[in-house]
Amino acid sequence: MTWTIAKSLRLGALGLFAAALLGGPALADGMPKRGAVKKTETTPEPRACTLSANVALATEYIFRGFSQTAEGPAIQGGFDATCGRFYAGVWASSLDWGVVERRGVDDTWAYMELDVYAGFKGKHGHVAWDVGVIYYAYPNSTRNDFGTFDERFRNEYVEVKAGLSGEVWKDGTLGVTVFFSPDYQYETGDVWTLEVGFAQALPKHWGLTPTLSALVGQQWGNDGAYAARVAGGEDSYTYWNAGVTLGFLEKWSIDLRYWDTSLDRDFCSGPTFQCDERFVATLKFTY
């Protein structure tokens, strides 16, 4: 496939990434202003720290358009800590990447994804910014037939991200996030990902708090391995989703979502990593 706007989007993504990294902290709420700090203040005001946890059950785990559970269900959960503008967390999900034979015994290629992330976020007026780093790990997926580490099976990778979001009208939020990995999954070289999302909160009815949301993502890679393993022979692909999240009983939510990609249906078919259209339901509890 050929994307005529790929180059302009990539340049825009680079500009947004640099602006968020270099200019983000200067936009933060609460930054000292000239003459605003009283001379009698000798210590900064303590920043509140919070800790939360979540657990979810999904009919399928989709990541950037690809099924991570071979069209099967997933159990997921994580912990998040926030202290001032700094945040950090860990999140995990069950996986089903298929079965391979190791030393004559069937073994699951990868049974779990474990993400560790941290960053800084703030707000200036109606615009929020977020810069961070994410480490994606897949325990057990880097073994060869002898059970030892093998570079050919390397799947873990690191991404840095920068995002901006803001309210465009009452309860309607538009956000743009850029991700970059210097060595993406499956040893596929440097990869850029641009996501644009929108969410609209609706009035509460019958004890339900609905939010409509949609997201479009575009990913680019410049390595032959990326084209062969991720983008169906091309140097980029597009993915999108749209759905509704229903909050209830304060800490519970149900998300109903439609996913699809621009990838060829022949490339998307198979026993694992399906990337055609599908519907996903997720029940989540946060505390």
Please tell me what each predicted stretch does.
Residues M1-T50:
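Cleavable N-terminal export/targeting peptides
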Residues D29-G98, Q219, R278, K284:
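Short glycine/proline- and aromatic-enriched beta-strand/turn motifs that initiate or cap beta-hairpins
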Residues K33-A36, F86-N155, P271:
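Surface-exposed loop and membrane-interface regions of Gram-negative outer-membrane beta-barrel proteins
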Residues C49, E71-I75, A110-L114, V127, ...:
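Residues that define the transmembrane beta-barrel architecture of outer-membrane proteins
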Residues L57-F63, C83-R85, A92-D96, G122, ...:
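Transmembrane beta-strands of outer-membrane beta-barrel pores
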Residues R85-V90, G125-V131, W169-V176, K204-L212, ...:
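Repeated loop/turn-to-beta-strand initiation elements of outer-membrane beta-barrel proteins
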Residues N155-G232, Y258-W259, F285-T286:
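Detector for outer-membrane/organellar transmembrane beta-barrel domains
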Residues L246-E250, F273-Y287:
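Outer-membrane beta-barrel "beta-signal"
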